[in-house]
């Protein structure tokens, strides 16, 4: 007797999430595990944070492992994917989450700052996707990280970050064509303001005169950007990522889903 298929479950799948020791990436990893996937938790600096995520996934009844890699280094991306396949015996889902934020008038941007942002947000994601394609089983999923500022929301002094994410939208469109030979779908999520430690460190830039307010006051103000009058949280993003990772999302391909509660 064949097993009953439960929609949106990920039992038997193996997922890898870059930058998943905290924030949105950690929420992705935990939700993938909650739905039955075995998860590779990638981190670059804090093994303690990554191991907490691993423990949480194991506590949900799935399996996970933390693997260090700096996705700005292509050789480390290759090694990360190789280790993931060796550890779990395959790979079905790759979520590219690692990224950095940047603010500044484009007239003041240095070459060093340009390279810092694009090396991770754009170049890093390109090569994560390349290695995902090479390592994924047929019928796999590649899910990249864009931003609502890439196209939908114009924020002053945010050109470098917005541009680094805008490239992801083009990558997704073309990658989805190229990956069809392995029946791999390629999509991205484009979050708006999402309450994480990164949000609190830079929210003053999104609100006129934001320096006059506390982090808590800025969070309360940001809730009114959405007609739903609440903040976005990592779980809001993770739930959509898990949908894109599921069999039920097979016909969603080459798309960028804006996740900002209608703010943009």
UniProtKB/Swiss-Prot annotation:
For the ligand (NADP(+)), the binding residues are 24, 70, 97, 130, 161, 165, 196
The record's induction entry says: Expression correlates with the formation of the sclerotia and thus the pigment production and is directly regulated by the cluster-specific activator CPUR_05433.
Endpoints of the signal sequence = none
Which EC class does it fall in?
A: oxidoreductase
Active-site residue list: 146-147, 161, 165
EC code: 1.1.1.-
InterPro entries named among the record's database cross-references? NAD(P)-bd_dom_sf (IPR036291), Sc_DH/Rdtase_CS (IPR020904), SDR_fam (IPR002347)
User: Single GO molecular-function term?
Assistant: oxidoreductase activity, acting on CH-OH group of donors
Which pathway, metabolic or otherwise, does it act in? Pigment biosynthesis
Query: Which UniProt keyword terms apply here?
Result: NADP, Oxidoreductase
**One Pfam family, short name:** adh_short_C2
Stated family:
Belongs to the short-chain dehydrogenases/reductases (SDR) family.
Reported function: Short chain dehydrogenase; part of the ergochrome gene cluster responsible for the typical purple-black color of the ergot sclerotia. The ergochrome gene cluster produces several ergot pigments including the yellow ergochrome secalonic acid and its derivatives, as well as the red anthraquinones endocrocin and clavorubin. The pathway begins with the synthesis of atrochrysone thioester by the polyketide synthase (PKS) CPUR_05437. The atrochrysone carboxyl ACP thioesterase CPUR_05436 then breaks the thioester bond and releases the atrochrysone carboxylic acid from CPUR_05437.
Mind telling me what this protein is named?
Answer: Short chain dehydrogenase CPUR_05429
Please give the organism: Claviceps purpurea (strain 20.1) (Ergot fungus)
């Amino acid at each position: 007797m064949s097993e009953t298929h439960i929609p949106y479950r990920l039992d038997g799948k193996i997922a890898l999430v870059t930058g998943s020791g905290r924030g949105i990436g950690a929420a992705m990893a935990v939700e993938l595990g909650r739905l039955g996937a075995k998860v590779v938790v990638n981190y670059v600096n804090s093994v303690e944070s990554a191991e907490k995520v691993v423990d949480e996934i194991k506590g949900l009844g799935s399996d996970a492992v933390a693997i260090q890699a700096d996705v700005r280094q292509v050789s480390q991306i290759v090694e990360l994917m190789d280790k993931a396949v060796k550890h779990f015996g395959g790979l079905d889902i790759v979520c590219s989450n690692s990224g950095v934020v940047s603010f500044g008038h484009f007239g003041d941007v240095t070459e060093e700052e340009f390279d810092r942002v694009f090396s991770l947000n754009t170049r890093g994601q390109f090569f994560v996707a390349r290695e995902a394609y090479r390592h994924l089983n047929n019928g796999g999923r590649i899910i990249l990280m864009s931003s609502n500022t890439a196209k939908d929301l114009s924020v002053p002094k945010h050109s470098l970050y917005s541009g680094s994410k805008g490239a992801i939208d083009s990558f997704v469109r073309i990658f989805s064509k190229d990956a069809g030979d392995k029946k791999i779908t390629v999509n991205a999520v484009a979050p708006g303001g999402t309450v994480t430690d990164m949000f609190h460190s830079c929210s003053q830039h999104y609100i006129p005169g934001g320096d006059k307010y506390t982090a808590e006051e800025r969070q309360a103000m940001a809730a009114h950007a959405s007609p739903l009058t609440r903040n976005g949280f990592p779980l809001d993003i993770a739930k959509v990522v898990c949908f894109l990772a599921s069999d039920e999302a097979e016909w969603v391909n080459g798309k960028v889903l804006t996740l900002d509660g209608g703010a943009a």
